[in-house]
Amino acid sequence: MAEDPGLWTLLERAPIDWKEPWLIGLAVFHILCLIVTYVSFKSYPLQICHFLLMVVLVSCAEYINEFAAMHWRSYSKQQYFDSSGMFISLAFSAPLLCNTIIIVVHWVYKTLCVMTELKTLQQKRKESREKRKKKE
């Protein structure tokens, strides 16, 4: 039985010229988005803006795909943008959605931490009230 090819093998076999400047730029863009996602953990307003910007970009992917399909000759050696939008979904939207998922997971984690802290404070207040009642 044949072994399943790995992700890198599939990427190498794909008819995509990964050395095209715009694809390198797209990769750099996604790396920068990941860095901003990490840095934004320290700044809630930055994180919200970054999250919303990525959601808007994913929402506009269909329009970006149509525009790129009409003008691909001006920046690319071959046409990657088909009517189904598979390439833009994988190369553009999926990494952005991964970043948004990271942010949502961070928000859930922070919420759980705050809820735990709140419950701990409630328990401490309850215990201190009970101690005061016993003293009276």
UniProtKB/Swiss-Prot annotation:
Coiled coil: 112-136
Domain of life: Eukaryota
Subcellular location: Nucleus membrane
GO MF terms held by the record: DNA binding
GO BP annotations listed: fat cell differentiation
Keyword list, A-Z: Coiled coil, DNA-binding, Membrane, Nucleus, Transmembrane, Transmembrane helix
DNA-binding as annotated region, ranges: 106
Side Nuclear, residues: 42-43, 106
Keyword Transmembrane helix: yes
Stretches assigned to the Perinuclear space side: 1-20, 65-84
Membrane topology, as annotated: Multi-pass membrane protein
Annotated Gene Ontology cellular component terms: nuclear membrane
TM spans (from-to): 21-41, 44-64, 85-105
Family: Belongs to the TMEM18 family.
Protein name: Transmembrane protein 18
Species annotation: Xenopus tropicalis (Western clawed frog)
Lineage: Eukaryota, Metazoa, Chordata, Craniata, Vertebrata
Gene giving rise to this polypeptide: tmem18
